[in-house]
Amino acid sequence: MTSGATPRPLSFPGLLIWRVGGDLFFASIAHFDEGLKAALAANRPAAKHVLVDADSVNFIDTSACDAALNSIKELQGQGITFAFARVRDDVREWMRLGGIEAVVGPTNFYERVTDGVRAWQQRGILEVPPRNRG
């Protein structure tokens, strides 16, 4: 499993678009946690919002749900907000059962990454940088 920041043609100050590169299970969740925290530490200006691109996640087990939930809560405690995009229905159901959906908020799940970015812009969470306007 690989994870990383998803290259995007548009950039938004304070936003990290994080792409999960595979299934999440007991043996891979540490890579997710460590990679996400490293990407947040390297992101400048400092990201306060994380949009997780979960298109490559076909499976998540209960141990991964528990570990991801703990990581999300820890980072939320540091003022970081989360949303998810491109989550498959069965993975979303496991996330709901595992408590991730309740902590992130059911309205913070989007069909596409661009839907999440637009929603956060409309709610005033993200600003469109001047170079990306018009």
Question: Where are the predicted features?
Answer:
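Structured cytosolic domains appended to multi-pass membrane proteins
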Residues: T2-G134
